[in-house]
């Protein structure tokens, strides 16, 4: 491919429908504004529900799946069922049990991580305000 044909190829690509979907180049400041973690850049306080919503949902779903697994496992060992149903229940019960326990533990571990992030964010905001106080004088 020669240098003369390269710009023509680019012109054809710019007219394609995919070129309309491409974003224009952004500066660093506009990238910060459109970043996913926009809450880092805003100073509005968030409620506890907004902060801990995801771990609470994960723990609730994990607890429900764990309870379902316990019930199925208990039924598999207490009921007199056919061999086929019994073998299915003995496989599915512990599967739900372990999945629920895993989700419950993930939610429980997530809470201290969020608390640590909140403390770090508070310290960061304090240091930022202290820095701006001394720099404006």
From Swiss-Prot:
GO biological process, one term: regulation of sensory perception of pain
Keywords: Membrane, Transmembrane, Transmembrane helix
InterPro entries: PIRT
Coiled coil: none
Cellular component annotations (GO), alphabetically ordered: plasma membrane
GO molecular function: phosphatidylinositol bisphosphate binding; phosphatidylinositol-3,4,5-trisphosphate binding; transmembrane transporter binding
Spans traversing the lipid bilayer: 56-76, 94-114
Keyword NAD: no
Top-level taxonomic group: Eukaryota
Places the protein is found: Membrane
A Pfam family matched in the record: PIRT
Membrane topology field: Multi-pass membrane protein
Cysteine disulfide links: none
Assembly mode: Interacts with TRPV1.
Described purpose of this protein according to its UniProt entry: Regulatory subunit of TRPV1, a molecular sensor of noxious heat and capsaicin. Positively regulates TRPV1 channel activity via phosphatidylinositol 4,5-bisphosphate (PIP2). Binds various phosphoinositide, including phosphatidylinositol 4,5-bisphosphate (PIP2), but not phosphatidylinositol (PI).
Name of the protein this chain belongs to: Phosphoinositide-interacting protein
UniProt organism field: Homo sapiens (Human)
């Amino acid at each position: 491919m020669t240098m003369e044909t390269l710009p023509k190829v680019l012109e054809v690509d710019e007219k394609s429908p995919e070129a309309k979907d491409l974003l224009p180049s952004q500066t660093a400041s506009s990238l910060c504004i459109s970043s996913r973690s926009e809450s880092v850049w805003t100073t509005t306080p968030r409620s506890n529900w907004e902060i801990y919503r995801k771990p609470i949902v994960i723990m609730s779903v994990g607890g429900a799946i764990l309870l379902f697994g316990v019930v199925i496992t208990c039924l598999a060992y207490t009921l007199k069922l056919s061999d086929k149903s019994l073998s299915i229940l003995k496989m599915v019960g512990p599967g739900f049990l372990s999945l629920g326990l895993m989700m419950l533990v993930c939610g429980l571990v997530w809470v201290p991580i969020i608390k640590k992030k909140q403390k770090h964010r508070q310290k960061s905001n304090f240091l930022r305000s202290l820095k701006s106080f001394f720099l404006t004088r």
